[in-house]
A protein has these predicted regions:
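Membrane-embedded transmembrane alpha-helical bundles that form the catalytic cores
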Residues: 1-426, 430, 434-473
Length: 474
């Protein structure tokens, strides 16, 4: 079930609100949310609810087991086993197809194609990357002594399966919400802020991201070698806007929904496209994922405490894992290593040059160029496609398609507005930024804007069937 669907907006969510707010008993409210979350997940993939329940049970029992141990050696063995089993589940469903494709490619190259592996493709359960990482953070935190093992399996189940952030994040760490599960308050101010945040996120998705997505997908269906330089750049820029409004829009909706039920989730985006370095970009983009990798991979590897060379290696390992987490494909791995390489280069000295540069505009141009080129790898179906698009971008080609074939005044207007709303307008006018994230809705204009946005999005849903979420693939 999608947040941006009529069923969710006008059936599921009102029903959950009604059942949730007819009682003030927190245990009953948690039961309502857990039941709703399982139903939400089962709506699209009923059989994979069992997989999620297995994950919940696995991590619950390992958490209890680790929490009762006295021997550090046994605790380490138990947490290693649990992490392995979690990654085994994730690896089987997400990376098995990719592994077989690699094996067949190697067999074809070195064995002449005489022997290849036949297999039935395994479907990817929606949200498995997100809830697996949440479960891992719980078990590791119990092992580290950061938190106590949760004895109530229903509380842990709600943490892992909570529908606002189940499908596409933010990745919530257990120690950030464990107290909220057991004790939280729902206020009128929180509800108002949550509705406003959800409405803005829905508008980002429906009015901006979907418009850009339709154009980008149409362009990707054409022979890429015949796009021409102008269209290739237009494709890259529109996808850059699409993925930001798609993913940040979903995060806004998730944060807003959580607030409506009394939960405070961490911010996942902080205007990443106004960054002046790639290092800053990753402090602003998908914050919950980057902090997860920092806390559970980069620091355990040694972080930056074991010399420069080791730091560079650790960064490349983390961004290899970041790329692989996003998708089982060479394009995602290259995208991750590409960003990791620029982070290494910035640590080697480029970062200091950027800090000393008096012309900050050049820093913005550098960062924007690196990010836009990186998104080409992320969007391309194959490395060959990415190579063709990049060739079109950096060597002048006329192409056979006029730009007017792909864009119209609506797309151009939304693209310009999208660029402004990606951080430029908020930087120029800080009050706009404060307004978007203030915790109270006290003005009539806020209510009017929310009503208009919900109406426009509903009309869009009624008239259109195009409604993909990029991060649902992960």
């Amino acid at each position: 079930m999608l947040f941006s669907s009529l069923v969710f907006l006008w059936c599921f969510l009102p029903a959950v609100f009604f059942l949730y707010f007819i009682t003030k008993n927190l245990h009953i409210r948690n039961s309502v949310l857990l039941t709703a979350s399982l139903f939400f997940y089962a709506w699209g993939e009923p059989k994979y609810v069992i997989l999620m329940l297995v994950s919940i049970g696995l991590n619950y029992f390992f958490g209890l087991w680790i929490g009762r141990m006295q021997s550090k050696h046994r605790m380490r063995l138990a947490v290693t086993t649990c992490v392995f089993l979690n990654l085994l589940l994730l690896g089987y469903f997400k990376y098995f197809n990719f592994a077989v494709e690699i094996a067949n490619s190697l067999l074809s190259r070195f064995a002449g194609g005489a022997h290849t592996l036949s297999f039935r493709e395994i479907a990817l359960p929606v949200g498995i990357s997100f809830y697996t990482f949440q479960a891992l953070s719980y078990v590791v935190d119990v092992y580290r002594g950061t938190i106590q093992a949760q004895k109530n399996i229903f509380h842990l189940a709600l943490y892992i399966s909570f529908f606002p952030q189940l499908i596409a994040g933010p990745i919530v760490k257990y120690h950030d919400v464990c107290e909220q599960i057991e004790n939280r308050q729902c206020t009128a101010e929180g509800m108002a802020y949550g509705i406003k945040r959800f409405s803005y996120g829905l508008a980002k998705k429906m009015l901006f991201a979907n418009t850009f997505a339709a154009t980008v997908d149409w362009m990707m269906e054409k022979p890429l070698a015949q796009l021409g330089t102008v269209n290739a750049w237009m494709l890259a820029v529109l996808y850059t806007l699409q993925i930001y409004f798609d993913f940040s829009g979903y995060s806004d909706m998730a944060i807003g929904l959580g607030k409506m039920f009394g939960f405070d989730f961490m911010e996942n985006f902080n205007y990443p496209y106004i960054s002046t370095s790639i290092r800053e970009f990753w402090r602003r983009w998908h914050i919950s994922l980057s902090t997860w990798f920092r806390e559970y991979l980069y620091i355990p590897l040694g972080g930056n405490r074991k010399g420069q060379v080791r730091t560079y290696v650790n960064l490349l390992i983390v961004f290899f894992a970041t790329g692989l987490w996003h998708g089982a494909g060479a394009t995602f791995i290259i995208w991750g290593l590409y960003h990791g390489l620029f982070l290494v280069v910035e640590r080697m000295g480029l970062g200091k040059l950027l800090e000393k540069n008096c012309f900050r505009g050049l820093n913005h141009i550098y960062t924007a160029l690196v990010v836009v080129v990186g998104w080409v790898f992320f969007r391309a179906d194959t490395l060959a496609d990415a190579k063709v698009i990049l060739h079109q971008m950096f060597t002048w080609e006329n192409g056979i398609y006029p730009a007017s074939l792909f864009v119209n005044p609506k797309v151009i207007f939304l693209a310009v507005l999208g660029v402004l709303l990606s951080g430029i307008a908020q930087s120029i006018c800080p009050k706009l930024r404060e307004h978007l994230y203030e915790k109270e809705v006290t003005k009539t204009v806020d209510i009017v804007i929310m009503a208009v946005l919900l109406f426009l999005c509903t009309m869009y849903l009624v008239s259109s069937t195009y409604n993909p979420f990029i991060y649902f693939r992960f």
